[in-house]
Amino acid sequence: MKTSKVMTAKEAVSKFVGDGMTIGVGGFFHAISYVITHEIIRQQKRHLTICQPSFNEHADQMIGAGCVDRIVSSYVWMEVFGPLHCFRRAMEKGIPHKIEMEDYTNFAVMARYLAGALGIPYIPINSMKGSDMMNYSAWMGENKVKLVQDPFGSGKEYAAVPALTPDLGYFHVQRADEEGNCQMWGIWGDSPWSMRACKEVIVSCEEIVSRDIIGRDPNRTILPGYKVVAVVEAPFGAHPKHTQGYYDVDRDFIFKYIRESQTQEGWQKFMDEWVYGVEDRVGYLKKYVDTYGMKKFLDLKASDMSSSSVNYGF
């Protein structure tokens, strides 16, 4: 019997995100779920460990809001847009409180997720060998990474990293059905493996479609519904990042955040206006249109570049 998992972001976060959880965050600049991130902040979840190969300002906002105690990642930065100031304040000054970061390479975090998704306890990699990352650990100690010999006799040595299996994951996709079968195209990043490694997953999507539409294009299904506990329909749910086929990156808005968050007071003003001051994503988008105008909003929408159709018959 089909079971609908559709609910609001508020309901999903309230029901499935608990204090002290280890949370996997999907997306790689593309299709990052700000609708869930902002709801976690509004509900004041605490003592979270957040995991992602590379973090952007979604992590910075959770850190500034006091949600995060620990990070598993390779960096927390905003690419060409500049540094993330809440992360630096927390690491350097303990504002709002001190946080810890277990520092891996980008690939090593991905490999840990891969091991978790495959159900194996660890995975050997070439990454990290010979670097200071082998010598430093925030809280995992000797269990962060270990050198292992090739058991098949080559004599080669590898860095073995443990499987990463977060309590919960969340990510954003273009479309999903009511049962949680998720389809994504464009930059996948870590999402196919990180979300499989998580024990449960909340998915936000641009639109909910029928099971028939999902079934007609199975190769785009990157996560099956049995992993998903909640489906949140949220158009523009990844703004200010992009979602391919729906809207582009809002560079001006990202620069605005980087600029205003340079001071604690500026960051608080931004958050009061764009996160705490709106009830949900609908309110967020309404405020955006009221502030910047409908033309600016519509200019973000993606141009049409449709893929060729394929024949699945046999």
State the predicted function of each range.
Residues 1-314:
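Conserved alpha/beta enzyme-core scaffold
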